């Protein structure tokens, strides 16, 4: 029955999830969850990484999986996302890079209340993280954006940022120019101003914010490209920015200190001992909760590294679950 809670788990496919949540909702859910991370009402252990050949030769599957548990106080929900990416056979089969499932439990009794696709939720919340970080750091409504990577995540980042800001100019670079041209066509109604497809990566490093969502293993964003007054978001699995920029940024902001130091843009500098916890100015949660302030000035450059936390996924999934129960959507399954 609609609106009735039982001990059955509900099962939700990606298509069902897509119909149960909007980007507008996700941006606000992530805002509340960042505040919870800042004030201690969200519990988010460091993700556990299983290397399936992403960085090691064995096993040879060119993939990884992460286990990402969290408890979100404002939603009173606990859960885990089991998610990863594969570039080997999965890519050959034409499947998306990311594979992802989210399990939710009743946090008081511990029964499994939902199992749902996590890929769409991951995509939306990854964009919403950036939008919220900008909300806490920029004191303006109209912004210019530089974007590296015109794939699914490039679209999602732009959608999310457009919920909170008017994008008056967007410069996009992709190694496949066709992808960038297609992006410009797809996003013309989302971006208020002009979308400029650039041939040289240097020409995309212009704006209030520079967002990189690529699978590049090259450190292609050069220190000398990044002008004062810019916030840079390297969101890929690897570094994307050169060492010089990482070590000379005026402030470093992260979503989760334990994770951000060991994966993504800061991992190599951490490994070499050049970056430590002492170098982190604040977490996005501290900014959201008002514990620290970081409004960018015209003469500083900020590096912001939101690696992604299970808390965001569980928070969004909790609202998807609530909407599914209210609308009577989803299959039922009794595990025990």
Predicted segments with their positions:
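NAD(P)-binding Rossmann-fold cofactor-contacting core
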Residues: 164-187
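Adenosine-phosphate binding glycine-rich loop
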Residues: 14-18, 245-336
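Glycine-rich Rossmann-fold phosphate-binding loop(s) that bind the pyrophosphate
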Residues: 150-151
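N-terminal ligand-binding/catalytic initiation module
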Residues: 3-123, 131, 141, 282, ...
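Short acidic low-complexity segments
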Residues: 191-207, 220-224
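An anion/phosphate-binding loop that grips the pyrophosphate of nucleotide cofactors and donors
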Residues: 207-208, 249
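Short helix-loop-beta connector
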Residues: 137-144, 166, 227-228
């Amino acid at each position: 029955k609609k609106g009735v809670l039982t001990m059955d788990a509900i099962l939700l496919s990606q298509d069902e999830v897509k119909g149960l949540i909007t980007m507008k909702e996700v941006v606000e859910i992530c805002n509340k969850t960042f505040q919870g991370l800042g004030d201690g009402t969200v519990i988010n252990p460091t993700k556990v990484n299983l290397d399936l050949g992403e960085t090691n030769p064995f096993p040879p599957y060119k993939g990884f999986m992460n286990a990402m548990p969290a408890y979100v106080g404002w939603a009173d929900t606990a859960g885990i996302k089991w998610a990863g990416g594969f570039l080997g056979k999965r890519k050959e089969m034409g499947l998306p890079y990311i594979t992802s499932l989210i399990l939710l439990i009743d946090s008081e009794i511990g029964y499994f209340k939902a199992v749902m696709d996590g890929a769409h939720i991951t995509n939306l919340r990854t964009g919403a993280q950036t939008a919220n970080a900008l909300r806490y750091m920029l004191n303006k409504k109209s912004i210019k954006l530089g974007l590296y990577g015109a794939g699914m995540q490039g679209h999602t980042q732009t959608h999310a940022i457009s919920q909170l800001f008017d994008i008056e100019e967007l410069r996009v670079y992709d190694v496949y120019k066709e992808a960038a041209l297609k992006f410009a066509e797809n996003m013309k109604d989302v971006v208020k101003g002009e979308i400029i497809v650039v041939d040289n990566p240097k020409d995309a490093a212009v704006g209030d914010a520079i967002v990189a969502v690529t699978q590049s293993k090259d450190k292609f964003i050069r220190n000398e490209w990044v002008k004062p007054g810019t916030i840079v978001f390297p969101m890929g699995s690897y570094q994307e920015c050169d060492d010089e920029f990482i070590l000379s940024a005026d402030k470093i902001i992260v979503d989760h200190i334990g994770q951000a130091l060991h994966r993504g843009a800061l991992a190599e500098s951490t490994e070499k001992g050049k970056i430590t916890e002492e170098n982190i100015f604040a977490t996005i949660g501290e900014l959201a909760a008002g514990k620290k302030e970081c409004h960018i000035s015209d003469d500083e450059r900020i590096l912001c590294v939101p690696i992604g936390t299970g808390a965001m996924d569980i928070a969004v999934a909790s609202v998807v679950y609530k909407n599914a129960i209210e609308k009577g959507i989803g299959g039922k399954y009794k595990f025990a």
